[in-house]
Amino acid sequence: MPQESSDAKRIEPPRKVDFMLKPRFTNTVPDVPFDAKFMTCPFVPLGRFVEFQPAAIYRDYKHAVICDDDMGLNVDLIDLKKYDEDPIETEIDEKDNILLEDDGAAKLIAKRSQQHSKLVPWMRKTEYISTEFNRFGVTADRQETKLGYNLKKNQQVEDMYRDKQSQIDAINKTFEDVRKPVKEHYSKKGVKAVEESFVFPDFDHWKHLFAHVQFDGDTITTEFEEEDERQQARESSVIKAMEFEDQKFAAVFVPTIGCLTSFMDDLELERPFDEDMKYEFLLSREYTFKMEHLPPRDRDVFIMYHRNNVFQYNEVDCNVKMTRKPKMALSRKSKLTLTYRNPSELEQKDMNKREAELYEQPKTRKQEILEKIQEKKEEGGDSSDQSSDSDDDKPQKSRSDSSSDVSSDDDSPRKKEPTVDSDSD
């Protein structure tokens, strides 16, 4: 009898060669014309779960809009004509009307077995003693003995805004509710509205920059006879950046009695200042400061004031925190003399630009980045042109430097700084 050897090779079936080709996808869908947005859920308010306040990292994050690559469809995302009503009413077939009917929640239950599952507070369903059936316990929905459970369950509106007409009625109701005056606070009992007023931007002073300055104490050390003079001196004080023996700090100067008198005369004459008058201020305190500039998109602090029966607000350009120095560098008798002037052409141009930005639509992050890149490219091109013609500009530059020394300080463009003379005794 022949014996089969263990070393015999195993016969394998031949491997089939399939046609393999990597699939190629094309995406012909146009770009989305606007960024992705979060939509509020009208059914469940998110405030009942957590009080969420979006931070800057959430506002700056761009959510990716993921579309199928093989969708070769021309999608028109914005078509305002779809919301227009068709003046010509088209008749719909009776069979199609049956398909368009809403599923009514109040239909009568035809089956008798479904009527036996009603929950009443004076009956309790039979519970079978079993490890498998009763393992997870009785949930809150199965507690039929709770008083008023069936009444509370009937009040829950599960199919809210299911049809088109209910949504239209709910939207129209919001316009009617807005017309009703609201006098009482929504959460605090006893708090009622006393006066209603409009809130507008300060169109007159929007061109000026405002700063939010925080002090750690009273800034006035001079003694005044009346409290009104002290308050007027506090409002008219001047903060000036100083540098003394490699020390940088901010000094607060308080107007003198004669300076306050000049301010009152200007108010009576209805003029901003007197060009020939020199206003004197005395040193009050010295502070170390920390300044934080706020970009236009992240400005969430505004100043608000009541003027002409209208509330007005303005933006805060920067936050400044002042900390009092334990040891003063200048003398207590240091004096600051100011002479006011009208803004220069460059300053007036900046004011007009800021005033025009009030009526413009705010720019997105992408637009700001593209504008900065474009400005850097233009500056790079200007610097290359100047370096190529540096030999021709040298004598002209020396003449301009010599002429600038002779010219007065008022001709040079600077940003809203009065002429300052600091004299220390």
UniProtKB/Swiss-Prot annotation:
Keywords: Coiled coil, Nucleus, Transcription, Transcription regulation
Record region (Disordered): 331-425
Compartments, record wording: Nucleus
GO biological process, one term: transcription elongation by RNA polymerase II
Any single Gene Ontology cellular-component annotation: Cdc73/Paf1 complex
Main location: nucleus
GO terms assigned for molecular function: chromatin binding; RNA polymerase II complex binding
Biased composition (Basic and acidic residues): 344-380, 393-402
Coiled-coil region list: 152-174
Subunit and interaction comment: Component of the PAF1 complex which consists of at least cdc-73, ctr-9, leo-1, pafo-1 and rtfo-1.
Free-text function comment from the UniProt entry: Component of the PAF1 complex which is a multifunctional complex involved in transcription initiation via genetic interactions with TATA-binding proteins, elongation and transcription-coupled histone modification.
Entry similarity comment: Belongs to the PAF1 family.
Protein name as it appears in the record: RNA polymerase II-associated factor 1 homolog
Species the sequence originates in: Caenorhabditis elegans
